């Protein structure tokens, strides 16, 4: 493992001699390899190194962000709380029995420095139901930040000897909690493909890597988009859209079939789903 490398570049991934170059301590180093796994995130060099003519991207940027606060306070509940309110979305999550993470839907124009801890806790209280509000413990923040939300997919996910995985290939809004799940499944498919290649001299897994990943990716993208659309206020929602959200939430709570579908997608579909 090499840390604090700079000027990382991938070369000849569509040719016979794939390799990676990087600079460290004033020297240029080269790593020769059979394959390159592009697990370097949304802003990494791997996807950016693919010619524009060889890749297609799909993206939706949502018109709001999540203001997150981390604090050493007892969680309001041991289960996640998702709140859809007239004031916007809120999420309560526990990191441990003594540390909690909370989120508020805010406009993209908001600035962290304009949100005091007191203002955050007051707004969170306004978005919680009376029972949760009663159990809310407040305290000084350890960290506050605003994260934009987007849906993004790049196709395909393989270019010769270069494989994209995780955020390098796709982003989901955090509402559905599917980002790490998708990254792990990408790596699982890639591990199996490389194991078959080196153990059995089979390229079947390599050749089908992108299609297998993307089938799962788009299912998770659909769920994350749907859940985000359901739980948040959009500028164009209007009175009719608000009623549709309320009806959908009522259906989820009172229909066993709908609840099962939500649970199946939230937990994460099995690796061989639909195979």
Task: Give the predicted meaning of each segment.
Residues 37-44, 98-103, 121, 136-146, ...:
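Hydrophobic transmembrane alpha-helix bundles
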């Amino acid at each position: 493992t090499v840390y604090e490398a700079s000027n990382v570049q991938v070369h000849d991934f569509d040719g016979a001699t794939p390799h990676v170059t990087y600079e460290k301590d004033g020297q240029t180093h080269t790593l020769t390899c059979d394959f390159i796994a592009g697990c370097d995130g949304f802003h990494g060099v791997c996807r950016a190194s693919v010619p524009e003519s060889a890749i297609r991207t799909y993206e939706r940027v949502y018109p709001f962000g999540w203001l997150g606060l981390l604090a050493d306070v007892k969680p309001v509940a041991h289960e996640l709380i998702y709140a859809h309110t007239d004031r916007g979305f809120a999420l309560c999550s526990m990191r441990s029995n003594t540390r909690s993470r909370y989120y508020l839907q805010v406009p993209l124009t908001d600035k962290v420095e304009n949100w005091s801890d007191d203002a955050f806790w007051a707004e969170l209280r306004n978005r919680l139901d009376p029972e949760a509000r009663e159990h809310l413990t407040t305290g000084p923040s350890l960290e506050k930040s605003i994260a934009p939300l987007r849906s993004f997919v790049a196709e395909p996910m393989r270019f010769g000897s270069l494989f994209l995985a995780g955020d390098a290939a796709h982003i989901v809004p955090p509402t559905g909690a599917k980002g790490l799940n998708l990254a792990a499944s990408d790596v699982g498919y890639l591990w199996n493909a490389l194991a078959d290649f080196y153990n059995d001299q089979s390229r079947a897994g390599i050749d089908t890597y992108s299609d297998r990943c993307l089938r799962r990716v788009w299912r998770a993208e659909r769920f994350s988009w749907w859940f985000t659309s359901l739980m948040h206020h959009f500028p164009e929602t209007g009175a009719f859209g608000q009623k549709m959200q309320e009806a959908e939430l009522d259906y989820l709570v009172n229909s066993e079939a709908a609840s099962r579908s939500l649970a199946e997608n939230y937990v994460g579909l099995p690796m061989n789903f639909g195979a």
